[in-house]
Design a protein with these regions (language model features):
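NUDIX/MutT-family hydrolases
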Residues: 147-183, 187
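N-terminal leader/linker segments that precede catalytic domains of diphosphate-processing enzymes
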Residues: 1-80, 85-143, 173-211
Length: 211
């Protein structure tokens, strides 16, 4: 998919937003049950992540992901978007996402011509207690990015087609904290993208795949 086509489709987000594929949702095989409290009633910390689309060398659309360093406080070794908790000086969740992207991958939003397109459905992250809002944006040209060594082991520009409705979703079983889970994951290079990141990408793919 060309980046111009993707951006054109995303300029007017549907209301309501389509759901991510059900195959991505986790099933608890063992351990404590999942909380039944609605998202809006959970005690949580506001956070923002940047879902940044950038053109590949051939003009197709890619999305920037990070592989977290092993041994970090949360999400050690996992694939995620640049982002983190809101700080008091942040004007809004968009400011949070852009600030965190500058800190984690060295994004200069002005130099890259970043344009914010909107926000996707918030996700609650049980392990960190974050209420995460995905901020959708694109850059008109490929930005110069550098991983912050204390947080990011590498930066991945994943093809957007890897998350469209026809994309492969692998079924995985793993121990996550106190729970044994079965969940769906997107294969990207030598990694598996799962959890909240996969659900955000699945919703993005559902938006782009609508007729």
């Amino acid at each position: 998919m060309r980046i111009e086509e993707a951006v054109q489709r995303l300029r007017t987000l549907p209301d309501p937003l389509p759901a991510a594929p059900r195959a991505l949702m986790p099933t608890i095989l063992g351990g404590p049950p999942r909380s039944s409290v609605p998202l809006g009633e959970l005690r949580s910390t506001p956070a923002g992540v940047l879902v940044l689309l950038v053109p590949a060398l051939d003009g197709t659309a890619t999305v920037i992901l990070t592989e977290r360093v092993v041994g970090g406080r949360y999400h050690s070794g996992e694939v995620s978007f640049p982002g983190g908790r809101a700080e008091p000086e942040d004007r809004d969740v968009i400011a949070t996402a852009l600030r965190e992207a500058a800190e984690e991958v060295g994004l200069d939003a002005d130099a890259a011509g970043v344009e914010v397109l909107g926000t996707l459905e918030p996700v609650w992250i049980p392990v960190s207690g974050f209420r995460l809002t995905p901020v959708l944006a694109w850059a008109g040209h490929r930005p110069a990015l550098t991983p912050a060594p204390s947080e990011v082991s590498r930066i991945i520009a994943a093809p957007l087609t890897a998350f469209l409705p026809a994309a492969e979703i692998r079924r995985v079983e793993a121990q996550v904290g106190e729970r044994r889970l079965r969940y769906g994951a997107y294969p990207v290079e030598d990694l598996l993208v799962w959890g909240a990141t996969a659900r955000v990408l699945g919703q993005l793919g559902a938006i782009l795949g609508r007729s």
